[in-house]
A protein has these predicted regions:
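Non-catalytic, conserved peripheral segments adjacent to functional cores
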Residues: 1-106, 127, 134-191
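Conserved metal-binding segment of the jelly-roll/cupin
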Residues: 103-127
Length: 191
């Protein structure tokens, strides 16, 4: 397992070690011990989620507020996505900035998104199957969301805006500047 830093502290790309031969391949998708040793992050994932989405689908931007905030570890089993994490920690030097990483069945990369970030993705290839681990349970009362096409964030989703397939619920998400309840950069959400 190899850990790559991104432009935003805490958002990490994980590249597993792949073993290939004439039979196919094998890799360890996650090891809690190795992850903690390589990153210094001690988190315990308690829920696994899976979604299937067609090319052109955009999901997000979603987050859960404290005390139900979630870290996520996202990977693609089939297809390809552009995975996006937006820093929504007030006071952060990267507040309002985002990281976008292509995750695919070919590159086997994973994206670790810490608490304090909004998450979304667009489907670039195939009928994408996305799996993600969460370190806190889903809590509908703590749901938060931001419009995927917020001009202030200016996220390049690698999709044509008027052809994006977005849920009715996500179309109603507020703009970033309208979100009153976000995170505080100086608060430890893992304590």
């Amino acid at each position: 397992m190899r850990i790559l830093k991104t432009d935003i502290e805490g958002v990490l790309i994980i590249e597993p070690q792949l073993f290939e031969d004439e039979r196919g391949y094998f890799f360890e998708a996650f090891s809690e011990r190795k992850f903690a040793e390589l990153t210094g992050i001690k988190t315990r994932f308690v829920q696994d989620n899976e979604s299937r989405s067609a090319v052109g689908v955009v999901r997000g931007l979603h987050f859960q507020l404290p005390p139900f905030a979630q870290s996520k570890l996202v990977r693609v089993v089939r297809g390809a996505i552009l995975d996006v994490a937006v820093d929504i920690r007030r006071g952060s030097p990267t507040f309002g900035r985002y990281v976008a990483v292509e995750l695919s069945e070919h590159n086997h990369r994973q994206l670790f998104i810490p608490r304090g970030f909004a998450h979304g993705f667009s489907v670039l290839e195939g009928d994408a199957i996305v799996e993600y681990k969460c370190d806190n349970y889903y809590a509908p009362e703590a749901e938060g969301a931001i419009r995927w096409d917020d001009p202030a964030l200016a996220i390049d989703w690698h999709t044509i805006h008027n052809e994006a397939i977005v849920s009715a619920k996500d179309k109603l998400n507020p703009l970033f500047e309208e979100c009153e309840r976000l995170f505080d950069y100086n608060t430890d959400y893992y304590a």
